[in-house]
Amino acid sequence: MKVMMALLQKEWLEGWKSGKLIWLPIAMMIVGLTQPLTIYYMPEIIAHGGNLPDGMKISFTMPSGSEVMVSTLSQFNTLGMALVIFSVMGSVANERNQGVTALIMSRPVTAAHYIVSKWLIQSVIGIMSFAAGYGLAYYYVRLLFEDASFSRFAASLGLYALWVIFIVTAGLAGSTIFRSVGAAAACGIGLTAAVSFAVSLFPDGAKWLPAEICKQAEHILLHGERADFFGWSLTFSILCIMLLAVFSVWRFRRYESY
């Protein structure tokens, strides 16, 4: 237990030293802020964009607060996903290249201790950053649009946090596979993008994939209730996260040298 606590403290301090605990929440807040403001001011943006015939009027139906929140989640599913992957991609690869891993593993530290400590702290940072951005989006939606349900917001936040954990786990797995930071990022982004595309292309046959959690969160925002296969989606998402985490530990143990 002492070993795990020491590693957790190390990872948390590393988050401060690298600036990750500062730039990631700020970046997520910018992502969350952009969508509500863009939608709200879209008529003015189009009107002042020029190249419109004289006398032409633009008809723009203002979406509901829930629809804006769904649009914001879609934004997090692209830019947010990349930001989380970039924050995780060097977790193992950088320390191996700098010789830090060899120093840590020369002490009574197991592969499980090493990987799990990184997974826990990176997940906490990712969820905190997403919550900051999503919470800011909710604030502006309530300010600029119709009142959005807080219970729906909280439920969608909790569900999407599980997707953030999956993204973190995928990025960490990529960092254990490749020593190159770029290759690790490509692996993490490729895996999460493939899962998302599969759910979009095969909506009926891919309900068990973790990206279905995003659809569940959107359904709750719009309808205030769970969609079909909610239990299966939740169960298999947790299972996929566990399998990826176990794979990362297994891959780390197979290193011939750190």
From Swiss-Prot:
The chain crosses the membrane at residues 21-41, 73-93, 119-139, 153-173, 182-202, 229-249. Its main location: membrane. Disulfide bonds: none annotated. It is found in: Cell membrane. GO terms for molecular function: ABC-type transporter activity. The keyword Cell membrane applies. GO terms for cellular component: plasma membrane. It comes from the Bacteria. InterPro entries: ABC2_NosY/YtrC-like. It is a multi-pass membrane protein. Induction: Expression is sigma Y-dependent. Induced upon nitrogen starvation. The keyword Ubl conjugation does not apply. Keywords: Cell membrane, Membrane, Transmembrane, Transmembrane helix. PANTHER family: INTEGRAL MEMBRANE PROTEIN-RELATED, MEMBRANE PROTEIN. This is Uncharacterized transmembrane protein YxlG. It comes from Bacillus subtilis (strain 168).
